[in-house]
């Protein structure tokens, strides 16, 4: 699977992202880029989560997936990665937003 460059002028650029203040001029994506235009909710939190935080994240994420809501998170340790893992275990779709390139 090769990374895809999505420029702001491209029809593939996520529509909702166009309306934020200072949207990125380009995105690098890997995987199914169609889900970038589907409804999703960001689930983020502490890297040093508590057991309660983990339990609530799993419950919240599982419920969102049951309603076909995509999970968006940063892929960091803690709550972010718990959200992604829970989403995938429940057959959901997930988007990981990385602060740097795909090779890092």
Residue ranges with predicted function:
Residues 61, 68-72, 76, 80-104:
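Phosphate/pyrophosphate-binding betaalpha-module
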